[in-house]
Amino acid sequence: MDKELTVVIPSYNMERFLPKCLESFGMDQLRKEDGTLADALEVIVVNDGSADRTSEVAHQFEGRFPTVVKVIDKANGNYGSCVNVALRGATGRYIRILDADDYFETGECAKYLRFLISLHGAADLVVNDYDEVGASGRTSSVVRYGLPSDAVFPMGLLADGNEMLDIHGIAYRREMLVRMGYRQSEGILYTDAEWHSLPMSQVATVAYRPGVLTHYLVGREGQSMERDRFVGNVGMLEQIAKRLVRDFDGCPTSGPEDGRRYARKRILALLRLIYTMVLLGYMGVRAKFDLLGFDTWLKNNSRTFYDEMESSIVIGRCPFHYVTEWRRRRSDRTWRFRLARLALNMRTFLAAK
């Protein structure tokens, strides 16, 4: 049977988490229920030069499930290099990424595979719900997209809506990625922003299966979004943002219009995040990021994105357009900025209670 789904698992020093991740596919259960269904799944574990037993653990599962699990051992090259090497060897009709410290809802795996098979490749993008869990396994939040689930629908619905899809809730038709020559940046962090932005420009049709499929682990020590690590590596986020702008503007007519509208919206969201973090003092990023240099680069390289780069925060009942204010004054030390930071800190405090 041809592979319907390839799941790529980038793994660096993940011996503690990888067994739970791989067991979550319920491969024994799939074989008992429907042997052909197990054969529709391909799992590629990419060991990114780990110094622990990650490779050994992965090869143990490969020995148990040789028709499903494939292990690639490679020198360390960070997240994007794992995705790139897996893409070259993947055979599934659809492909998705699962971090080694995340895991599937085992009871949903078979249903999800059957859903993919039923599509016969009609959707370029397949969306699922996911939740965020802490180290104890307790769910902290659930992301339900609430999209139409009775039929494949056009990408325009997402382009016109407010949904911001994340890596935990998407699978792409692999042939689409091959056709566009998709390749992720290597040697840096935060390349998941590329995964849920650039391929979207090629999407014309979407399918949605409601129900939590993926459990996303948050709050683990050593994660790339951990405060101190994020602040120290924020320059990598700048590299990602520049690559997204260059690649998107470099192919102005490539892809369906609705796909490009959604991709543009996703890139704008990242740009706005950068300006917000710096100007409103989020996570201490302000001292580590040359926003003036980045803003000048954006103005010189993409006037369209530059002109659309506006964000505001409501102080009292009045919106404060802080990007415009900063560009006009070239300062973020005015009383309005002090009020904006206070308002943001209060909202963050209240949200955490």
Please report, for each region that a protein language model flagged, where it lies by residue:
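Donor-binding/catalytic cores of nucleotide-activated saccharide
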Residues: 79, 83, 100-209, 216-232
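A conserved acidic beta->alpha catalytic loop
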Residues: 24, 47-57, 78, 99
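Short aromatic/hydrophobic "clamp" motif used to bind/position activated sugar donors
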Residues: 95
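Glycine-rich, basic loop-to-helix element that forms the pyrophosphate-binding segment
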Residues: 74-90
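Cell-envelope/extracellular polymer assembly enzymes that use nucleotide-activated donors
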Residues: 4-6, 42, 194
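Short, well-formed alpha-helical segments that are part of the catalytic scaffolds
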Residues: 14-35
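Membrane-interface aromatic/basic loop that binds lipid-linked glycans or pyrophosphate carriers
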Residues: 280-353
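Short beta-strand/loop segment that forms part of the nucleotide-sugar
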Residues: 34-49, 70-75, 100
